[in-house]
Curated annotation (Swiss-Prot):
It comes from the Eukaryota. This is LSM complex subunit lsm3. Component of LSm protein complexes, which are involved in RNA processing and may function in a chaperone-like manner. Component of the cytoplasmic LSM1-LSM7 complex which is involved in mRNA degradation by activating the decapping step. The LSM1-LSM7 complex loads onto the 3'-end of single stranded RNA. Component of the nuclear LSM2-LSM8 complex, which is involved in spliceosome assembly. The LSM2-LSM8 complex plays a role in the biogenesis of the spliceosomal U4/U6-U5 tri-snRNP complex by accelerating prp24-mediated annealing of U4/U6 di-snRNA. Residues 9-93 form the Sm domain. The modification Phosphoserine is found at residue 84. GO terms for cellular component: catalytic step 2 spliceosome; chromosome, telomeric repeat region; Lsm1-7-Pat1 complex; Lsm2-8 complex; nucleolus; nucleus; P-body; precatalytic spliceosome. GO terms for molecular function: chromatin binding; RNA binding; telomerase RNA binding; U2 snRNA binding. It comes from Schizosaccharomyces pombe (strain 972 / ATCC 24843). CDD domains: LSm3. It is found in: Nucleus; Cytoplasm. Keywords: Cytoplasm, mRNA processing, mRNA splicing, Nucleus, Phosphoprotein, Ribonucleoprotein, RNA-binding, Spliceosome.
Amino acid sequence: MESAQAVAEPLDLVRLSLDEIVYVKLRGDRELNGRLHAYDEHLNMVLGDAEEIVTIFDDEETDKDKALKTIRKHYEMLFVRGDSVILIAPPRN
């Protein structure tokens, strides 16, 4: 990734992330990790080799540790609608 001096506008940071692995937080307790192939000004984007992580809260479960469940799905290529995007960042460890 290039230096922070190349970032003059918010979408410049996204541009610098092209062909890099990114973390995308979505509405509805969804998260994505994948390679950013394309995006537009609405933050519609195409991710390759993407993993979706969905967090579900089971309110009928009495044990709070077991109430939170995650479901993971893998996609070779995925289109993400921009109005569902909350944030884009480098991948979390």
